[in-house]
Amino acid sequence: MRCVPVFIILLLLIPSASSAAVQPKTEKDDVPLASVHDSALRILSRQCCITIPECCRIG
């Protein structure tokens, strides 16, 4: 019966130990979603202008 409290304490410690090992995300890893979206539009626009000139954006 003495093992039951020890087992319960170990079960409670396991989730907290895994969260301590996770490193916080730094700001340099963050990529603004707007820049990703703009890059995708730029690439699609460039490919579209090569194949179909009518779909090019003005400006």
Curated annotation (Swiss-Prot):
GO terms for molecular function: toxin activity. The modification Isoleucine amide is found at residue 58. Keywords: Amidation, Disulfide bond, Pyrrolidone carboxylic acid, Secreted, Signal, Toxin. Residues 1-19 form the signal peptide. Expressed by the venom duct. Belongs to the conotoxin T superfamily. This is Conotoxin ViVA.
